[in-house]
């Protein structure tokens, strides 16, 4: 509309996330090819979230498919303030700056507390990662826990398990977009290769984690490869939890246990990473 009719519109297309790239992938590619602008909202997203409808409707890979379209910018936010920041930035980029891009944003229908936005996190939300919680513990054993979407709630819950039962301090990071972090990492790698005489550029995720102590663990409601694409850019030990395999029909709690992405498996994985480093 903005090109053919000089009438900019702000389309929002809301659907079950499995019915997006899984069902209309050619149209999503055509949207990129034709330089469409707007927002795709993948609702009830994640393999353990649309929990009663089995493998047909449980989406564990839409963000992986979104990553194949160069001008599709994808996010997996957890909190309302993250969603607001992302949409505000998208409106500015598409309709004020005139950038030819469209957005894929996954959302849930799960009831949980939405905290106030921490001060100064807007840039991190847009670029793909920010620190949600920093442990006040002085414990020498420390881990970095990362997550997105609905599974970030399990990541937050794992903090108490590690602290109370094992004396391990845990910082929490919200990873709003692994895809955008990877694109940034690849862009830095290419720039460094093509400009050996200039100061090295650090990927954003490398920069924010370079002073963080201990191994990193990331859990999402998507296949492990979604998180694993960040491995080259994360300093130190990096462990990934995800929902590989077909979906199943059961409660969300049982599905998160089955796919090993709940708070207990996050804690176990963190302890295993500390063990591998000789910290415990």
Positions of PLM-derived features:
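Hydrophobic anchor at the start of a short beta-strand
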Residues: 11, 38-39, 170, 238
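A short, small-residue-rich loop immediately preceding and capping a beta-strand
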Residues: 6-19, 39-42, 147
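A glycine-rich helix N-cap at a beta->alpha junction
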Residues: 30-47
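Buried hydrophobic packing segments
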Residues: 1-3, 24-31, 87-90, 270
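Extended, hydrophobic alpha-helical segments in both membrane/secreted and soluble proteins
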Residues: 10-15, 23-27, 31, 62, ...
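Thiamine diphosphate
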Residues: 48-61, 67, 74, 82-86, ...
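Alpha-helix C-terminal capping segments
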Residues: 1-8, 30-35, 67-69, 230-233
């Amino acid at each position: 509309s903005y090109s053919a009719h000089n009438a900019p519109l702000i389309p929002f297309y809301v659907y079950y996330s499995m019915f997006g790239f899984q069902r209309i992938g050619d149209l999503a590619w055509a949207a990129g090819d034709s330089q469409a602008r707007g927002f795709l909202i993948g609702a009830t997203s994640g393999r353990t979230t649309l929990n009663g409808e089995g493998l047909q409707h449980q989406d564990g890979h839409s963000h992986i498919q979104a990553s194949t379209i160069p001008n599709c910018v994808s996010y997996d936010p957890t909190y309302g303030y993250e969603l607001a920041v992302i949409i505000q930035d998208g409106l500015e980029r598409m309709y004020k700056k005139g950038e030819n891009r469209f957005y894929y944003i996954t959302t849930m229908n799960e009831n949980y507390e939405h905290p106030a936005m921490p001060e100064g996190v807007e840039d991190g939300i847009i670029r793909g990662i920010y620190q949600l919680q920093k442990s006040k513990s002085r414990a020498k054993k420390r881990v970095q826990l990362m997550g997105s979407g609905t599974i970030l709630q399990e990541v937050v819950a794992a903090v108490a398990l590690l602290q109370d039962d094992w004396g391990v301090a845990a910082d929490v990071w919200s990873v709003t977009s692994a895809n955008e972090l990877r694109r940034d990492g690849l862009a830095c790698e290419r720039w460094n290769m093509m400009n050996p005489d200039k100061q090295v550029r650090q990927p954003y995720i490398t920069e924010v984690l370079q002073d963080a102590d201990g191994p990193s663990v990331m859990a999402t409601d998507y296949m492990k490869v979604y998180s694993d694409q960040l491995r080259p850019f994360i300093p130190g030990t990096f462990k990934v939890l995800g929902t590989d395999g077909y979906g199943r029909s059961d409660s969300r709690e049982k599905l998160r246990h089955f796919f090993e992405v709940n708070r207990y498996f996050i804690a176990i994985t963190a302890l295993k990473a500390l063990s591998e480093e000789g910290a415990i």
